[in-house]
Amino acid sequence: MFGKNAKVDLELNRDVEQLIKTGGKEKLLPIVQAGEPVLRQRTVAYNGQLSKRTLAKLIDTMHTTMLEAPGVGLAATQIGLGLALAVVEDHVRDDEDDPREIAEFPFHVIINPSYKPTSDKTASFYEGCLSFDGYQAVRKRWLDITAEWDDEDGKHHSEPLHGWPARIFQHETDHLSGELYIDRAEIRSLTTNENLEDYWCEDPVPTEAAEELGFAL
């Protein structure tokens, strides 16, 4: 459980309830875009500031918003809320032939997440962000990490993640520190989603894009 002395922040709880209501019956919240100050602010650690009921509603609304976008992760900052929590989920078939090492990543609520690399191996692939809508860029990330987080019940988790699930976890955790993926991306690789589909999707390894657009892998 979260801290024994944790108390619900009544003002914050009311604000979050109002935020949830803006999603309507569809439970769809607007996703804030790059340039909004909240995306650049370090979040406050979650320690029970919301009632269990409000937290459950927030998680449900974030999950619905993420899936509808569609995306595989959504941080609280992306809906304008400066708390250290995010939701992640990617239902894909494991593909041993895909160099991105894509694998099933079941739904998780990750609260106060952190990660550490467990090897010096990195991988560079295109990735995108719901708060930098319409574009993707090549970002180098750790291939293997130890991921740590609390779930919605306050239980602590520590698990190894590899490949694409590790990339998703790093992306969402970085959001909660005020970082966007584009901050450390290969800027010359930046492309619209349409151009990515037209030019660079045939091979997930962006070797040709690096040669044509002039960036290093």
Swiss-Prot record:
Its EC number is 3.5.1.88. One of its GO terms (biological process) is translation. It is an enzyme of class 3 (hydrolase). GO terms for molecular function: metal ion binding; peptide deformylase activity. InterPro entries: Peptide_deformylase, Peptide_deformylase_sf. Gene3D superfamilies: Peptide deformylase (3.90.45.10). The active site is at 172. SUPFAM superfamilies: Peptide deformylase. Binds 1 Fe(2+) ion. It comes from the Bacteria. It catalyses: N-terminal N-formyl-L-methionyl-[peptide] + H2O = N-terminal L-methionyl-[peptide] + formate. The keyword Metal-binding applies. The keyword Hydrolase applies. Its cofactor is Fe(2+). Fe cation binds at residues 129, 171, 175. Keywords: Hydrolase, Iron, Metal-binding, Protein biosynthesis. It holds the Pfam family Pep_deformylase. Removes the formyl group from the N-terminal Met of newly synthesized proteins. Requires at least a dipeptide for an efficient rate of reaction. N-terminal L-methionine is a prerequisite for activity but the enzyme has broad specificity at other positions. Belongs to the polypeptide deformylase family. This is Peptide deformylase 1. It comes from Bifidobacterium longum (strain NCC 2705). The gene is def1.
